[in-house]
C-alpha cells in the first residue's frame, strides 16, 4: 500500500498516468517509460556527484578571492601564490590589487574572502600581523656624503598614517623639505633615488634590490619608524578549506 500510494502521488505530481494496472501487475505507459529514463539518468548523475564529493574530501578546491595592497602584491605576493598554487593546484584564484583603504572596503562588502593591507585599520574580525618592517631613509651612493639639506627630497603620496609618521620625523629633525619631485608609486620613488635625483623615506619592503644607502629611522624618543602589513578575513569564511590553507601558508611565510 505504501508503494502504491507513492506511485499515485508521483502520477499526481506529473499530471500523467505512468502505469497501467491489472491483476498481473503494472505496465509502464509511454509517459512512464520517459519518466523511468529521467529517473535512471538522475540516479547515475547523483552517484557520480557522490563519488566526486568523496574524492574532494581530501582535495582543496573551489575559488579563492583576494584583494591585496599594491605594494604587497609587487614585493611579496608572487612568492606566496607560487607556494600556494603548488600546494593547492585545484583552487581557482581571483586576485585584485588596490590601495589598502579600498582593499578593506572590498572586504567589508563581502566581495572577497581575504584582504592584505598595509597600515593600521580597524577591523573587528580575523586580523593577523604578517610583517612589521623598518622605515628607512634612502639615498644613492654618489650622494652618500652630501648633506640632506642640499639634496632634493623625493616625496611620495601614501595613507594618512604613513604621511603623519614621516611629517613627525621631519619636524623632530628640524627639516622642512619641499617635495620638488613628488611621485605616487613606491618603486618609482626608489628608482628616482637610485638615479641620484635626491633622497626619500620609504618602508624597507621595496629595498631588496636597492643598491644605494639605506638607514632605519627613529623618532626623537628612540621609537623606530615601522610599517605593518596585516591579513584581514571574515571568521566564518576562514572555515572554507581554500581560505584556511591560504591563511596557514601566508602566515608560515610571513616575516613577523
Predicted regions and their residues:
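Central regulatory/effector-binding core of bacterial HTH transcription factors
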Residues: 61-122, 183
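Hydrophobic hinge/microswitch elements
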Residues: 99-100, 108, 118, 174-218, ...
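Short coil/turn segments
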Residues: 24, 69-74, 119-121, 135, ...
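Alpha-helical linker/hinge and terminal dimerization helices associated
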Residues: 13-14, 35-57
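A short LG(V/I)-centered, amphipathic sequence patch enriched
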Residues: 11-28
